[in-house]
Regions:
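Short glycine/serine-rich loop segments
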Residues: 1-91
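A short helix-breaking turn/cap at a secondary-structure junction
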Residues: 53-141, 200-205
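Acyltransferase
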Residues: 108-111, 132-159, 189-194, 205-206, ...
Length: 237
């Protein structure tokens, strides 16, 4: 896997760890990653750079291999906030090839960086601070002091529903990923096993040989979820 440019014995995070390692190691000026549940933001944090997951629909997903379609987004990985804004402005355009594409709303982000933050409200969920390491907590508190000195209003609030976020994420992500991976059957595109007896044998061998063990476990584990969601959620959608 990709190594952390600041310490080769450490990982770069994932899943967009390769691009974060390249940008953090000054191999690339910027990069694009895909983020479903932190895959841009986590490696960017590990490598000491800026990673942004845009609002859903702001950036076209056309060409991205889908994992969980309702959560996937493409975003910039850069060494500064200014660069992130410039790259985001360049990629946040409406694309008719993506049915969920909305494009950027409002003024270009790079232009808004010149504005001060006086009077802006910045919310911090108390639950996010639970279990945070002391040095990380101090870094957050130091950042809060900077924002306050610049005129921002810091608001601490409770988010009790946060405890459901992870299980809900895994239910939706696994079910959608399992469905999306169903297209890789060796018929249209992707890997195809060279030896098979019939169509069923070809599909079974293709998916067994082409998918790693972790992906196979995900597909099998998600099947009951897909059936349950399709039955109970039919009227909602």
């Amino acid at each position: 896997g990709a190594r952390n440019p600041h310490n080769l014995n450490h990982v770069a995070g994932g899943s967009s760890g390769g691009v974060a390692s390249a940008v953090g190691g000054n191999i690339a000026v910027y990069g694009l990653g895909s983020d479903t549940g932190g895959s841009i933001r986590q490696p960017a944090s590990f490598c000491g750079i800026v990673g942004m997951k845009p609002t859903y629909g702001a950036v076209s997903r056309f060409g991205l291999i889908a994992y969980a379609s309702s959560l996937d987004q493409i975003g910039p990985v850069t060494t500064s906030v200014e660069d992130a804004a410039l790259v985001y402005d360049a990629i946040s355009l409406y694309d008719k090839k993506d049915s969920t594409s909305q494009g950027r709303k409002g003024a270009p982000c790079a232009d808004t960086l010149k504005n001060d933050i006086k009077g802006m409200k910045i919310g911090i969920a108390r639950e996010y601070m639970d279990g945070v390491r002391d040095d990380v907590r101090k870094a957050i508190e130091d950042a809060v002091k900077v924002y306050e000195s610049l005129g921002a209003e810091i608001v601490y609030f409770d988010l009790p529903a946060l405890k459901y976020a992870l299980p809900v994420y895994y239910i939706l992500a696994c079910a959608e990923a399992s469905s999306n991976l169903g297209r890789y059957d060796g018929i249209r595109y992707g890997y195809k096993t060279p030896k098979y007896m019939d169509v069923n044998d070809m599909i079974c061998k293709t998916r067994s040989e082409g998918f790693g063990k972790e992906v196979q476990r995900l597909v099998l584990a998600a099947r009951p979820l897909r059936i349950s969601l399709s039955i109970t959620g039919h009227d909602c959608y």
